[in-house]
Regions:
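Active-site histidine-acidic residue metal-binding/catalytic motifs
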Residues: 1-73, 79
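A short, glycine/acidic-enriched catalytic loop
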Residues: 12-29, 91-114
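Polar, enzyme-active/binding microenvironments
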Residues: 44-47, 88, 113-114
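Histidine- and/or cysteine-centered catalytic micro-motif in compact active-site loops
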Residues: 57, 88-90
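Mature extracellular/periplasmic domains of secretome proteins
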Residues: 66-81, 102-105, 111-114
Length: 114
């Protein structure tokens, strides 16, 4: 299977991270953690015979978080992937909600997105 593995969020040109941080609660920086974890996930998927492309936004390049989506979508849409996975962490507070989406493409492939 051809898989795109994307890392949620980025490091902006001004040095700010666009993801959440749970450091206040003993956690971690979402972007840094997902970026590191994506290497492990990609290696495991490749070991099982899949073709994996990691898509990580260039660091200290974007001025705004709104530049992340088109950067990733251009690469995803050009890649003809069977599956797209984007890594995120849940927030360390009770105010955030998780979303589950199921998408179906024109080629009738179904996907679950967390």
């Amino acid at each position: 299977m051809k898989i795109a593995l994307t890392v949620g969020h980025s490091l902006l040109k001004n040095g700010c991270y666009t993801g959440a941080t749970g450091k206040k609660y003993g956690g971690c920086n979402e972007y840094k953690w997902c970026k590191a974890f994506s290497k492990q996930v990609a290696a495991a998927l490749r070991k099982n015979g899949h073709i994996v492309h990691r898509i990580v936004c260039p660091e200290k390049s974007f001025l705004s978080p709104s530049q992340e989506r088109p950067y990733k979508l251009d690469r995803i849409n050009a890649g003809n992937y069977d599956l797209v996975i984007e890594l995120h962490l849940n927030a360390p507070c009770r105010c955030s909600l998780t979303t589950l989406r199921i998408c179906q493409t024109m080629t009738s492939k179904r996907y679950v997105i967390l």
